[in-house]
Amino acid sequence: MDDTIDDEVISAGSTITVEFSGGAETLFGGVREHVVPLDGSKIVLLEEMLRWLRDNLLTGDAGLFMQENTVRPGILVMINDTDWDLMGEIDYILQPGDHILFISTLHGG
């Protein structure tokens, strides 16, 4: 995925929804929900989307969201309301219409 949004791709419905909750949204400019285009000409893994999010939407410290090529411990990831552990984690192949939810379970005190 690159950082350009192709109007043809969006009009064809080849997008996913990415949502941040539990404080994770503060790392993305306070925006809770983003519609992200998919490249319909190739298979896109969740791992690739994580890098795209880091490189294109992340406004906070990358270390608070990612650790190496995955999300850091303390961030729950749900794919269409199912724990990503059951879906293959970073090897999950994104599908048009997917809803990916990141929930931070780490709170300062």
From Swiss-Prot:
Kindly list the GO CC terms recorded for this protein: cytosol
Q: List all disulphide bridges recorded for this chain.
A: none
Q: Which InterPro entries match?
A: Beta-grasp_dom_sf, Mopterin_synth/thiamin_S_b, Urm1
GO BP: any one term: protein urmylation
Q: What is this protein called?
A: Ubiquitin-related modifier 1 homolog
Glycyl lysine isopeptide (Gly-Lys) (interchain with K-? in acceptor proteins) cross-link position in this chain? 109
Question: For this protein, what post-translational modification is recorded in UniProt?
Answer: C-terminal thiocarboxylation occurs in 2 steps, it is first acyl-adenylated (-COAMP) via the hesA/moeB/thiF part of the MOCS3 homolog, then thiocarboxylated (-COSH) via the rhodanese domain of the MOCS3 homolog.
Report the protein's function: Acts as a sulfur carrier required for 2-thiolation of mcm(5)S(2)U at tRNA wobble positions of cytosolic tRNA(Lys), tRNA(Glu) and tRNA(Gln). Serves as sulfur donor in tRNA 2-thiolation reaction by being thiocarboxylated (-COSH) at its C-terminus by MOCS3. The sulfur is then transferred to tRNA to form 2-thiolation of mcm(5)S(2)U. Also acts as a ubiquitin-like protein (UBL) that is covalently conjugated via an isopeptide bond to lysine residues of target proteins.
Keyword tRNA processing listed? The answer is yes
| Protein location | Cytoplasm
Instruction: Cite the Gene3D superfamilies for this sequence.
Output: 3.10.20.30
Question: Which keywords are on file for this protein?
Answer: Cytoplasm, Isopeptide bond, tRNA processing, Ubl conjugation pathway
| Similarity comment text for this entry | Belongs to the URM1 family.
* Domain of life according to the entry: Eukaryota
Pathway annotation = tRNA modification; 5-methoxycarbonylmethyl-2-thiouridine-tRNA biosynthesis
Q: Does the keyword tRNA processing apply?
A: yes
Q: Name one Pfam family in it.
A: Urm1
> Where, per the database record, does this protein carry 1-thioglycine?
109
